[in-house]
Design a protein with these regions (language model features):
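Solvent-exposed, non-transmembrane regions of integral membrane proteins
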Residues: 1-821
Length: 821
């Protein structure tokens, strides 16, 4: 049957390029494998050439798949399931790219694209390591290709195809109106596409600029871990157990920098888009990304140890192998659906669990077996490191990082243990503290070791020189610490004095880390920044620690409920920590006066932007924050909020919406009820009463407007609410050319409208009173003050700059040595 309006050519081209991706990566893997095995140089050259052509073919295919899928999404071709599920016509152009990585298929393609780019760079620069390293990278590409084929092999579906048509996805099976004779068992109508007006849209939480740039950086970090892994396996394969260190070092630095930045970009997205009031929640998916970075950092430091002293080569092999395996394990965790109930980041289950598990095991089993088999052959120095040597303490630091990673991944894997062993292990009652109570001591140890490591020499250190060089850093650090102790605070006593004291210790040592490493730039490398990459990275790391410790321990909720107005709140929200603002009614909040000035709606979506004015009570500052909220968005019940923040050099004011009126109650169906009263009389309404204060008549009115005998009557009223609040309102009515024209007064906080219908000079008045829920416009918000959070963000970038600077220097040195040879 021909279906009207379908565009099949893009999908057919996409299917062709997926097939080329699959075949090209397989041929590249085999070609490079044979190139690594053969002895004759002529044969090796031919296999290498075939490998390069095949790898280039699969790389072009991945790029073409990416371009075609973007074309489908951009042109709203909703006959394709991926476009219908992840995009909509109302989606802003800048968020179209984010549609790729909302779905599993698109994120696999992003991973493959990043890995292709790295593979092309390796072809150019790997030299004699090209064949074994590219064989492993190509096999990883082949594994990713199987994830997006959607082919059936002996009844088993391999992967999920991004070019699947909507009519083949099963989504329309239960839509009788789209089938012939309204029978779901009959084929779809030829014109079914005319009923598909729009797509399902992108998750509102992903409609943020960080989600356009964060996933590509993160997946480049994921992809980059294959390179040190491939070098390590290639070394075991070719028995060149020590020679791989030099070419692997720049890649290790690159991977550590990019993956670290990618992870913290996710923290920035969480800070600006999620409403839990922070940047890190020890979410299982966050942890699954953090652990490979930690083992990669451990591997980087043991690699440096081996390069300088010959120690720790076995540990370097293990750490780099585990880094990539943890990436694959995190892929299994986030995509298998096993974390669906414990993480806000996890993908939904596409029925690929066995394939994802195979992806992990097919790398894990051979690589770990190869490592164990070759363990005794890996060179090692029998003489123990000196306790005063740099390598001794660097290894201790690497070991601490590794053990910390094992603790994190162990707790993160509780759902996996429960699934495997049919147990019911429950996470701790306070999940965040269960992590923090361990990691605070890791932070203390690492801060101390990071501060002193550069002042130690490899193999042995002269104590006199060490203490001489450390004199000024220690002195300045003590002064800075005393300054913070007397002027700063750690307002975190709810977990007891021991934990609070640990935070103090970590802050002091973080200051020491920053000052000691900044000093080393001048003491150790004489101010030559190009040689100070390690110290710069350590300064950034100290800033990250300090930013986390100060901002988290002193985070202050400033939206204390001072007006007592109740509002329906989401699960877990404390009414005492949420402040309700009635439109145009100023409310005190700490050192600010807040006013809800209005809102505006998105022209195409159920998205509201709220204008909240913050005024400093001392009159020195006046600004507006505009948090937004989604209500019943695309059928999802409840409130979804995006925060807004005001940034200062020393703190952030961070706020998000926690409650708004139900839009279905905003239609006004109530009517005025009339009362004939005189001065001093009382009128009762549902939430209180009114007293007529007086009747005033203004006769001096413009005759051209009011006529010859026109008058303006004003009736001030005192309003007494059940909540104890008192208000004054004034209702006015004009007598113009024989007709009454009322000018009502609205008391928004009470949902009350007072209308002066008639009045006379004796003081007798006829008042219309109306109460309506539609009148009461309010928002409830929660606000935090985050001190010195910029230390965290700047620290991330400084760490990355230091690592990339070190990478540049290593590449430059390697190139110079090759030229000299």
């Amino acid at each position: 049957m021909n279906y009207i309006g379908e565009h099949l050519l893009p999908g057919q081209l996409g299917q062709l390029f997926i097939l080329l991706f699959l075949i090209g990566s397989a041929v590249a893997c085999l070609s490079y494998f044979f190139a690594a095995q053969v002895k004759l140089e002529s044969d090796k050259s031919l296999w290498n050439l075939l490998g390069r052509i095949s790898f280039f073919t699969q790389a072009v295919s991945v790029l073409a798949i990416f371009a075609i899928l973007f074309y489908i999404i951009q042109n709203h071709l909703f006959e394709y399931h991926y476009a219908w599920k992840h995009s909509s016509r109302s989606l802003e152009f800048k968020y179209l790219l984010a549609c790729f990585w909302e779905g599993q298929e698109g994120s696999f393609l992003l991973w493959a694209l990043c890995q292709s780019i790295l593979g092309l760079l390796l072809i150019r620069n790997a030299g004699k390591w090209e064949a074994p390293v590219l064989s492993i990278v190509s096999f990883a590409q082949f594994s990713l290709a199987t994830m997006v084929t959607g082919l059936y092999i002996f009844g088993w579906k391999m992967g999920s195809n991004p070019f699947m048509l909507l009519r083949d996805s099963g989504v329309l099976d239960n839509a009788p109106a789209l089938h012939l004779n309204f029978d779901p068992l009959q084929p779809l109508r030829p014109d079914y596409l005319t009923s598909i007006k729009d797509g399902n849209d992108l998750n509102p939480l992903l409609q943020n600029y960080w989600m356009v740039i964060h996933p590509p950086v993160l997946f480049m970090g994921f992809a980059s871990t294959i390179v040190p892994f491939a070098y390590a396996i290639a070394a075991l394969w070719t028995k060149q157990l020590g020679e791989w260190i030099k070419p692997a070092l720049p890649w290790s630095l690159f991977s550590t920098a990019v993956l670290g930045v990618g992870i913290m970009m996710g923290g920035m997205w969480a800070y600006e888009s999620l409403s839990f009031g922070g940047y890190w929640a020890w979410d299982p998916v966050e942890n699954a990304s953090l652990v490979p970075w930690m083992t990669g950092v451990a591997g980087l430091h043991t690699l440096l140890i081996y390069k300088a002293t010959g120690h720790s080569l076995r540990a370097t092999f293990l750490f780099f192998i585990l880094t990539f395996l943890f990436i694959l394990y995190s892929t299994f965790l986030t995509r298998s659906g096993i974390l669906g109930e414990t993480s806000v980041h996890a993908f939904t289950d596409l029925g690929m669990n066995w394939q994802l598990l195979s992806f992990l095991l097919i790398f894990a089993i051979p690589s770990l077996w190869w490592f164990l088999k070759s363990y005794s052959q890996i060179p090692t120095i029998k003489k123990e490191e000196e306790a005063s040597s740099r390598e001794f303490w660097m290894f201790i630091g690497s070991l601490v990082i590794f053990l910390s990673a094992i603790v994190i991944i162990g707790q993160t894997s509780l759902p996996v243990f429960n699934k495997l062993f049919n147990t019911k292990l429950a996470p701790p009652a306070d999940v965040e503290f269960s992590y923090n109570s361990v990691q605070i001591y890791v932070a203390i140890i690492l801060a101390f070791l990071t501060a002193i490591s550069h002042y130690l020499k490899y193999r042995t250190t002269d104590r006199k020189i060490f203490w001489k060089n450390m004199f000024w850093p220690i002195g300045i650090s003590l002064l800075a610490s005393l300054l913070y102790i007397f002027m700063g605070e750690v307002a975190y006593d709810r977990k007891g004095p021991v934990f609070q004291a640990s935070i103090w210790a970590a802050i002091v040592l973080s200051l020491y880390t920053i000052i000691a490493n900044a000093s080393y730039i001048f003491i150790g490398v004489k101010g030559k920044l190009k040689n100070a990459g390690g110290s710069i990275a350590h300064v950034g790391f100290g800033m990250v620690l300090l930013g986390i410790l100060i901002s988290s321990s002193n985070k202050e909720i400033i939206s204390n409920n001072v007006n007592g107005i109740p509002a329906p709140l989401g699960k877990g929200e404390n009414p005492r920590e949420n402040l309700t603002l009635v439109k145009d009614l100023p409310i005190d909040m700490g050192s600010y006066t807040l006013t809800y000035e209005g809102d505006s709606a998105h022209p195409k979506k159920q998205l509201w932007y709220y204008k909240i004015r913050f005024k400093k009570k001392d009159g020195q500052e006046d600004f507006v924050l505009s948090p937004n909220a989604f209500v019943n968005y695309k059928g999802n019940q409840g409130l979804m909020a995006n925060p807004s923040a005001r940034h200062y050099w020393d703190h952030d004011v961070f706020t998000y919406i926690t409650s708004i009126p139900d839009p279905s109650n905003q239609k006004d169906t109530s009517r005025f009820k009339s009362y004939v009263q005189k001065t001093g009389d009382t009128i009762f309404y549902a939430n209180g009463y009114l007293i007529v204060d007086s009747t005033k008549i203004r006769k001096e009115v413009p005759k051209e407007l009011f006529g010859e005998n026109g008058k303006l009557f004003e009736v001030p009223l005192n309003v007494f609410s059940k909540t104890g609040s008192n208000y004054k309102v004034t209702s006015r009515s004009a007598y113009v050319k024989g007709q009454w024209i009322a000018l009502p007064d609205t008391l928004t906080s009470e949902g009350l409208i007072v209308l002066l219908e008639q009045a006379n000079e004796t003081g007798k008045v006829q008042l219309g009173i109306k109460q309506s829920d539609a009148i009461l416009k309010y928002v409830t918000l929660k606000a935090y003050k985050y001190p010195f959070i910029k230390l965290l963000w700047y620290g991330v970038w400084i760490t990355a700059i230091g690592l990339l600077l070190s990478m540049y220097n290593r590449i430059k040195k390697n190139s110079a040595k090759q030229l000299s040879i």
